[in-house]
C-alpha cells in the first residue's frame, strides 16, 4: 500500500477545495492510502474575522490539524506528500513555513530522502505569484531530499485558452479573485485530480508497492 498525505493551509477554502480534488485523484490509484491534513492557523481570531474567514474556515474544520507530535507518522511516514498553500508575496504562507521549519530533527535523520513531494497553490490574480510560490517551495523539498513531481503537459487542461484558469507544469493552481469570490473551476479541479493521481502513481513505483 502506498501512503500519500495532503498537507494544506487555507483561509477562504480555495486550497481546501483543491486539496479535496487532489485527494480524489490520489484515491483512484489502486492500493493508495490517502490522508488529508491542514496546518495550524497562526492568525488570531479577530484578524480572521476582519478577513471574513471565520465562516469559510468552518467548511474544513473537520479536517485534522497536523501537530508536531504527528510529524513522524503523517509527514515522514508517507511515501508522498502533496502540499497546498496560497501564495503570499510569491511564496508559501507563514503558516505552512512554520510546519516545514519544524522538520529539523527528521531532516537530520534523512527521513524524507527519496520520498515524493509536490505542490499546488492559489492566488488572487492571474499573475499573482503562483509559479514562484511552487518553485520556491521546491527548494525546501530538495533540501529534504525529496523527489519533485509536478503537473506534466500530458494534462492538456493547462493549455486551454478559452477561459481563465490556473495550472502550470509546476503544479495545479486556482485563481481566487481579489475578494476571494471566484471558486476553483472544474478545469482547475480536474488538474488537481490529475496531479494527485500522477504523484501517487509515481510514488507507488518508487516505493515498489
Curated annotation (Swiss-Prot):
GO molecular function: flavin adenine dinucleotide binding; FMN binding; NAD binding; NADH:ubiquinone reductase (non-electrogenic) activity; NADP binding; NADPH dehydrogenase (quinone) activity
PROSITE patterns noted in UniProt: FLAVODOXIN_LIKE (PS50902)
Superkingdom, natural source: Archaea
Binding site for substrate: 107
EC number annotated for this UniProt entry: 1.6.5.2
Domain Flavodoxin-like: 4-199
Protein family (similarity comment): Belongs to the WrbA family.
Protein's name according to its UniProt entry: NAD(P)H dehydrogenase (quinone)
Amino acid at each position: 500500500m502506498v501512503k500519500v498525505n495532503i498537507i494544506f493551509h487555507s483561509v477562504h477554502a480555495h486550497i481546501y477545495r483543491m486539496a479535496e480534488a487532489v485527494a480524489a485523484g490520489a484515491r483512484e490509484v489502486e492500493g493508495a492510502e490517502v490522508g488529508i491534513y491542514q496546518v495550524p492557523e497562526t492568525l488570531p481570531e479577530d484578524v480572521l474575522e476582519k478577513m471574513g474567514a471565520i465562516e469559510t474556515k468552518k467548511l474544513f474544520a473537520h479536517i485534522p490539524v497536523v501537530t508536531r507530535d504527528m510529524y513522524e507518522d503523517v509527514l515522514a511516514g508517507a511515501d508522498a506528500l502533496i502540499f497546498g498553500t496560497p501564495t503570499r508575496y510569491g511564496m508559501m504562507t507563514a503558516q505552512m513555513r512554520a510546519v516545514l521549519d519544524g522538520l529539523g530533527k527528521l531532516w537530520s535523520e534523512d527521513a524524507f530522502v527519496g520520498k515524493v513531494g509536490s505542490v499546488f497553490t492559489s492566488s488572487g490574480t492571474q499573475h499573482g505569484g503562483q509559479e514562484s510560490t511552487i518553485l520556491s517551495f521546491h527548494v525546501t523539498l530538495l533540501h529534504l531530499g525529496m523527489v519533485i513531481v509536478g503537473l506534466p503537459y500530458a494534462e492538456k487542461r493547462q493549455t486551454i485558452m478559452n477561459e481563465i484558469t490556473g495550472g502550470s507544469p509546476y503544479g495545479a493552481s486556482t485563481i481566487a479573485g481579489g475578494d476571494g469570490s471566484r471558486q476553483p473551476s472544474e478545469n482547475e479541479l480536474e488538474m488537481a485530480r490529475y496531479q494527485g493521481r500522477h504523484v501517487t502513481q509515481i510514488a507507488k513505483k518508487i516505493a515498489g508497492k
